Amino acid sequence: MPREKQKRGRRAEDKAKKDAAKRKRDEFPEESAVKRLKPSAETDTSNNEVTSGADYIPLEAEDGGNDVSMNDAPANDMPFYGLLDSEEQEYFSKANEVLELNQFHDAEERRLFVDSVYREADGKELKVACSQSCSRLMEKLISLSDMRQIRRLFNKFIGHFLHLVQHRFASHCCETLFINAAPGVTEKISKSKGRKAEVDEEDEPEPELSLAEMFMKVVEELEGNWGYLLTERFASHTIRVLLLVLAGEPVDLSSTDSVVASRKKERLGIVNTEASEENAVAERRKVPEVFEATLKKVMNDMVSGLDNTYLRALATHPVGNPVLQVLVFLELSHFGKASAKDPNSIIRRLIPDDDFGENAESSTFVRGLLYDPVGSRLLETIIKSMPGKLFKSLYKNIIRDRIGSLARNTTAGYVVLRTLERLGKDDLQDAMELIIPEIPGLIERSRLIVPKVLIERCLVRGVDTKPLSDALESAYDKNPARRLEQMLKLEPAASEEDSEEKQKQTGNNQTAAAEKLHGSLLAQTMLTASGPVSGLIYSSLLAQSAESLLRLAKDPTASRVLQQALTTPTSTSQFRRQFTTRFSGHLVELALDSSGSHVVDALWPATKDLFFVKERMAQELLKEELSLRDSFVGRAVWRNWSMDLYKRRRGEWASKAKGLDSIENGQGERPKSRIDLARAKFAAKAAEESSKAPVAAKT
């Protein structure tokens, strides 16, 4: 029988004693922690389920709820709604894929599928909303639901909103629910017989509360916790939507001016919704009268417990700043700008002084926001909505003399844009003179949004754009062809080896793509301005070679400039006569390209007064009919050019090409020829002379 392996000697004994002492020290903290409450068997089981399942991620551990002390914070006892089993997860994952593909034959088939998913999710709504993998499915379902389904789901969430809005995944479901329920707050509960029969079949009673009453229930649940939820990272975006719903303001996340979501907000759940539904979300709505009083109370409760110092600190808080933007926007736009005179109003607590003196408290606060990446967004909202008298004082004392240097800054430049939108003609003229010396530096650093907005505001206010045109011309290359390539960030044609190396170096470069986009937007804006500003782009387009034009037309970003040049009212018939013929011989190649096909579509209205050019282009397309019909984008070009009509009824196509068919249908007026214009001028002159003749006879 083998002996047990043992170590001999004093050193082995000493080492054994040290190991025993270490074990005692390791066990000591556990013995000293006996006072902590021992979890029950049920709690222990639930904790094991949470750690083992990756589907549910709680905000905080339930056991530590009594140890956390925060001002205005609710009891940190986040409930656990359970986990979906493997079969349920598999079903909901497949349902999510089906909705993502969106390959339904019609809206009715999609509605039946949504109904079946709701039946499967009955009783599991809270589990699905808190699930990491299935919460996105819940968002899609909500966006595709009718008001009856939204009311039922809303009713099941009531009583849990305080916890759901703080949950990492369920908070997004609450936000989507509020957005899609907003258009129905004025609807009354319908009690038709058809609805009762449908309820009996599904064995699910219709909620007794209307959507307006449900929103009031949400406010009651969250009451007393506004100060905490204001800076809670998951609840804050849901609170912003709730405030806008109570105010009846648009809650469309896709809008670029939306104060609801961040600029990187992902649009989930909006899968091919109807245009009428999107308009309902993006428009202002009538809301019940009780909403206005509730909104005022909620806004007051949010900031009443905060002193002025903490309120100003929220301006630079990454989570609290967007909520503060909504509060300021609603106070100034919804309750009237007269509310700014109230010393207890939010805008007055942020900016107590009207004069913005050198050492004034308001001046220090505003200057601190100018260069802050977070605070500058609040300043943008304030400038857009503040009363005119207060804005003039702010502009005169802080921004006017520094507008050139502010425009150079990456952060303060956005504040300058909001300022330019509010300036009158004289102030805009002075601001343009201060910004013009900075334009070469702005263009060199691709800060093109400042000259773009400056051109737009000059057109609105009627300011002469000649100095701006000279500055833009000097900032780019003197060669007209090279100028457009610089503006659109297009490198000259190179060999294949060089292009492959550049693709490897600049592959997936988002900065380069953004610069290219801003260059295209600047060129499109310049085309809308008549005179020398648009002339810079028109001369550059005419100077391009045929190869360069094809490269521009096939580029997704640059092709927009060609489309704008062909369709904008500032393009003259002389320019279009010279420019449209450049595409002859390449129409089929462009029509088969995803970007170039849009340029071919734009050639149809561009040749409205050039029938001989349009007919020649139609003949070129007809020769490659089979190639166009085999391509998706080619078929779109064939349809937009009415080529079937061109093949069968050439006379009707000619009338349509000249714009005569819209005249016959009463959709427009027939364009007058030169002889018609001369006749009308002669008739007007004769009528004027005949009216003067009796007057001369009387005298």
Curated annotation (Swiss-Prot):
<keyword id="KW-0698">rRNA processing</keyword>
<comment type="function">
    <text>RNA-binding nucleolar protein required for pre-rRNA processing. Involved in production of 18S rRNA and assembly of small ribosomal subunit.</text>
</comment>
<feature type="repeat" description="Pumilio 5">
    <location>
        <begin position="540"/>
        <end position="580"/>
    </location>
</feature>
<dbReference type="GO" id="GO:0030688">
    <property type="term" value="C:preribosome, small subunit precursor"/>
</dbReference>
<dbReference type="GO" id="GO:0003723">
    <property type="term" value="F:RNA binding"/>
</dbReference>
<dbReference type="InterPro" id="IPR011989">
    <property type="entry name" value="ARM-like"/>
</dbReference>
<dbReference type="GO" id="GO:0000056">
    <property type="term" value="P:ribosomal small subunit export from nucleus"/>
</dbReference>
<dbReference type="GO" id="GO:0030686">
    <property type="term" value="C:90S preribosome"/>
</dbReference>
<feature type="region of interest" description="Disordered">
    <location>
        <begin position="492"/>
        <end position="511"/>
    </location>
</feature>
<dbReference type="InterPro" id="IPR016024">
    <property type="entry name" value="ARM-type_fold"/>
</dbReference>
<dbReference type="InterPro" id="IPR040000">
    <property type="entry name" value="NOP9"/>
</dbReference>
<feature type="repeat" description="Pumilio 6">
    <location>
        <begin position="582"/>
        <end position="619"/>
    </location>
</feature>
<dbReference type="Pfam" id="PF22493">
    <property type="entry name" value="PUF_NOP9"/>
</dbReference>
<keyword id="KW-0690">Ribosome biogenesis</keyword>
<dbReference type="GO" id="GO:0005730">
    <property type="term" value="C:nucleolus"/>
</dbReference>
<dbReference type="GO" id="GO:0000480">
    <property type="term" value="P:endonucleolytic cleavage in 5'-ETS of tricistronic rRNA transcript (SSU-rRNA, 5.8S rRNA, LSU-rRNA)"/>
</dbReference>
<dbReference type="GO" id="GO:0000447">
    <property type="term" value="P:endonucleolytic cleavage in ITS1 to separate SSU-rRNA from 5.8S rRNA and LSU-rRNA from tricistronic rRNA transcript (SSU-rRNA, 5.8S rRNA, LSU-rRNA)"/>
</dbReference>
<comment type="similarity">
    <text>Belongs to the NOP9 family.</text>
</comment>
<feature type="compositionally biased region" description="Basic and acidic residues">
    <location>
        <begin position="11"/>
        <end position="27"/>
    </location>
</feature>
<feature type="repeat" description="Pumilio 1">
    <location>
        <begin position="120"/>
        <end position="155"/>
    </location>
</feature>
<feature type="compositionally biased region" description="Basic residues">
    <location>
        <begin position="1"/>
        <end position="10"/>
    </location>
</feature>
<feature type="repeat" description="Pumilio 2">
    <location>
        <begin position="156"/>
        <end position="191"/>
    </location>
</feature>
<dbReference type="InterPro" id="IPR001313">
    <property type="entry name" value="Pumilio_RNA-bd_rpt"/>
</dbReference>
<keyword id="KW-0677">Repeat</keyword>
<feature type="repeat" description="Pumilio 3">
    <location>
        <begin position="361"/>
        <end position="396"/>
    </location>
</feature>
<keyword id="KW-0539">Nucleus</keyword>
<feature type="compositionally biased region" description="Polar residues">
    <location>
        <begin position="42"/>
        <end position="51"/>
    </location>
</feature>
<protein>
    <recommendedName>
        <fullName>Nucleolar protein 9</fullName>
    </recommendedName>
</protein>
<feature type="repeat" description="Pumilio 4">
    <location>
        <begin position="397"/>
        <end position="433"/>
    </location>
</feature>
<dbReference type="GO" id="GO:0000472">
    <property type="term" value="P:endonucleolytic cleavage to generate mature 5'-end of SSU-rRNA from (SSU-rRNA, 5.8S rRNA, LSU-rRNA)"/>
</dbReference>
<feature type="region of interest" description="Disordered">
    <location>
        <begin position="1"/>
        <end position="66"/>
    </location>
</feature>
